[in-house]
Amino acid sequence: MKYFWFFVYEFIIIPIMVIIGLIGIYFNKKLRDGLSGRFHSRKVLKNYINDLNGDEKIYWFHASSLGEYLQTKPVILGLKEVKPHAKIIVSFFSPSGYNHVNDESIDCKIYLPLDFYWAVKSALHLVRPEKLIFASYDIWPNLIWAANELEIPTVLFAARFKKETGKLLPVVRNFYHHVYKDFHSIYTITKSDHNHLELMLKNSSNTTVRVLGNPRYDHVKGTADKFTMEHTKSVLSRKKRIIFASIHDEDQRVIYDSVLQLLNDHESLSILWVPHEPIASVINASIQRFNEEGYKVNVFSKQTPYDKDDPQVIVVDIVGVLSHLYWDGIIAYVGGGFSSGIHNVMEPAIARLPILFGPKYENFHEAEELINSGGGWAIDNGQELFDKINMLLSDNSKIIPASLAATDVIHKNIGAATRVVRGIIRD
């Protein structure tokens, strides 16, 4: 049956994906950049390998995008501590990872080659890594099957599955069964993920499966530790500021009127407004909307420094600063929950902020933990956002327990990176 699925994937699915990608490059710059980068990946690998002595141990990590790399980074750092002379290759699927990750712990960075069997087998044969390691969900069947044929152990960590995952549908499950069973080791985030995986494997695999947690908690904690000493004060000692982070158009349509109402009702309140895509048209539209309501707006960009004493509304036109900005707020709203799914809620949690987000959070274990602990809330409409934030702003006895509950979610989940590194080395 595996050969049947190989034929379907290699000669039907992948060609269709490539055709769609070739059409999409005329409309989407990210697709264009990604596809162009994939055609050069083998050349980059060959040049890198030719510069090595020949006896180095190489570990190849794959992360779909920036978010998955943030799960991967603490694992790479932990592996480097144990094996300081190991070489690290990291492949990315998305330009958001490739373009924004510049880390000294990475020895070679590439776009993931197109998942044609001949292409990925050639790349693996060239590199011959000790292990091929995937982060979270972005797995590519031919890459896994080729590694298995070349006897290169494959590892999947921070594996997670949607509650109603389509991977367990009868025909689809049979396909993914033949993909996942070729992994050497799989480390899931939760016991529920472990149970989904067991249903897929059907006890017919030699794959080692363990529940080891999510290393992204370790990354968030490690990042916060670098500047926490500057921000040891309670949320009640900070400026009364709400961080509206990673805002999509769908978020704006739902919450914008409620945000204005909060600003009108609380004179000392200020906000940081952080669009998900900080392109010029989005930034200018945000500025114009707040100006039309009578609010002076300052912009935080590469050219304009951030001033904590800025007026009521600050629009953020720069990426990579949210983890720091959260420490200047007392409450956070994290976007994406009215469209594709919520963004990173761990960073505001470690900054001790009560967190609100939209209804699409079910596939994010950390969001569920925040809700269960009292550190976060899902809202379905703008009125719910207003009521919850208004309650927190009006009653200090509500905001402090929520603040402590949010940060406790992070602290009780750290340590996964160490467990994953141990598994990579020992399993």
Question: Where are the regions that the model predicts?
Answer:
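Helix-enriched interaction subdomains in cytosolic or periplasmic regions
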Residues: 1-35, 287
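Active-site and donor-binding regions of nucleotide-sugar-utilizing enzymes
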Residues: 21, 25-226, 247-249, 262, ...
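Conserved catalytic-core segment of nucleotide-activated headgroup transferases in glycan assembly
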Residues: 68-82, 221-303
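Nucleotide-activated donor-binding/catalytic signature segment of Leloir-type glycosyltransferases, i.e.
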Residues: 101, 106-109, 284-316
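Hydrophobic beta-strand scaffold residues
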Residues: 152-154, 297, 355
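Catalytic binding pocket for nucleotide-activated donors in carbohydrate/polymer assembly enzymes
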Residues: 183, 322, 326-408
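Donor nucleotide-activated moiety binding/catalytic core segment of transferases
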Residues: 216, 298-340, 344-345
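C-terminal alpha-helical cap of glycosyltransferases
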Residues: 413-427
